[in-house]
């Protein structure tokens, strides 16, 4: 029986990222985890709200993400909840990220943590910070689209 790797089940989303940043490009990265971390994620416990991605010479790390200790694991088998976790990306993706991050105003933010089949993946975005007027414009455009949908719904 083939594994179903197309289905994705979301664990945690970083909703502020799309509000505070303009996402230029998205990447899907694997993440190096311990067993108790995976068990905790299967229970739906994780937070990437305060997390960010550091791009080093030859690898990328997720820093600041919190995966709470797994309650059923003993004290010796558990993990540190907010340790840095290595991201699994192709060498050319890491090179691309490293080059782009050196540009002014460009950063890498985690967008979503999810299960794809039995694997844990992290969707990261190459992002540029929004100014206050950009946030207002985005909000106005979203409101306009909502109003148009409402008007079209009443008409037909």
Question: Residue locations for each model-derived region?
Answer:
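Beta-rich strand-turn-strand
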Residues: 88-125, 129-131
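Switch/connector loops and helix/strand junctions flanking conserved nucleotide-binding motifs
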Residues: 70-72, 121, 132-134
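C-terminal end-helix/capping segment
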Residues: 82, 89-95, 128-156
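Short, surface-exposed linear motifs at loops/turns and structural transition points
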Residues: 2-5, 11-12, 60, 155-156
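A short, contiguous, amphipathic alpha-helix enriched in charged residues
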Residues: 4-20, 84-102
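A positional/architectural concept
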Residues: 10-55, 59
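Helix-adjacent hinge/juxtasegments
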Residues: 54-97
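Flexible glycine-/small-residue-rich
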Residues: 35, 55-57, 64, 124-128
């Amino acid at each position: 029986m083939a594994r179903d790797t197309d289905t994705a089940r979301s664990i945690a989303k970083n909703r502020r990222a799309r509000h505070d940043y303009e996402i230029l490009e998205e990447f899907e990265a694997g993440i190096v985890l311990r067993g108790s971390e995976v068990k905790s994620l299967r229970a739906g416990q994780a937070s990437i709200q305060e997390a960010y991605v550091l791009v080093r010479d030859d690898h990328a790390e997720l820093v600041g993400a919190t995966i709470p200790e797994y309650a059923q694991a003993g004290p010796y088998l558990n993990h540190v909840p907010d340790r840095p976790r290595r991201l699994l990306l192709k060498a050319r993706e890491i090179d691309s990220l490293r080059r782009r991050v050196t540009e002014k105003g460009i950063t890498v933010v985690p967008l979503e943590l999810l299960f794809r089949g039995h694997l844990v993946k992290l969707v990261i975005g190459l992002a540029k910070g929004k100014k206050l007027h950009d946030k207002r414009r985005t909000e106005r455009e979203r409101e306009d689209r909502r109003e148009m949908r409402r008007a079209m719904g009443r008409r037909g």
